[in-house]
Amino acid sequence: MKRLCIPIVETTMGKALIAIKEVNRLADLIELRADYLRGAKLALLLENRQKPFIVTNRSKEEGGKYKGEERKRLSFLQEAIDLGADYIDVELATERSSLQGLIRNKRGTQVILSFHDFRRTPSPKELQRLFGQMIRLGADVIKIVPFAKSWEDNLNILSLIPFAKARRQKIVAFCMGEKGKISRIFSPSLGAAWTYASLNQSRASAPGQLTVRELTDIWKTMR
């Protein structure tokens, strides 16, 4: 089953609420990129969701827009848990005790533990080592997204999906970049929990991200 997550990357509450209304029609999941949004009123945003909702507050070091104090960045994720968000996305690079605190206090929220590498794709052995580390930390969903410098990098990242399935672990895994587009398309067919697509080209939240229309058109031709 192919599942599609669409990120909300608006900068104002008004635009974010309009985008959520549109994304409710098109997506299986919604990701709020809170690092883009000024003055986020999280309770109001969650009230308007009709699909499972991921709250992400991505650090600048991992390709996000957040530039404030780390303490405030993480307290926003804790607020998302307290308000009943379906998922939070928190980086593996987060200071360990803070990360463990979020996982310990997650209540009914599932924790997506994420790793991004904007320079390269690790070897299959390195990817499996990362996977094991994230399992031990208590991730509900593992998300590993490196950068494809070659077509072969797609094979490396996609090989992690059956590896995770054999261990009954939910995973999101694909490559960023122009050469990584193919892994975005095929990862759900191999068993990834979902893949990401933007509402349009100007709203892409990562390099190589396809639009909803591009991705769904490709999937239709694959039937």
Where are these regions (language model features)?
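Conserved N-terminal beta1-alpha1 strand-loop-helix module at the mouth
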Residues: 1-63, 69-74
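Charged helix-capping and loop-helix junction motifs
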Residues: 69-74, 124-130, 156-159
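Active-site-adjacent beta->alpha loops and helix N-cap segments on the catalytic face
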Residues: 36-50, 92-108, 122-125, 149-164, ...
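C-terminal alpha-helical cap/extension of soluble enzyme domains
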Residues: 162-223
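Glycine-enriched alpha-helix->loop->beta-strand junction motifs that scaffold or abut catalytic
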Residues: 26-28, 50-52, 82-87, 104-113, ...
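Alpha/beta enzyme core
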Residues: 15-25, 73-83, 129-138
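Catalytic beta/alpha-barrel core
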Residues: 7-9, 29-38, 77, 85-96, ...
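Glycine/small-residue-rich loop that forms an oxyanion/phosphate-binding "nest" at active or ligand-binding sites
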Residues: 53-101
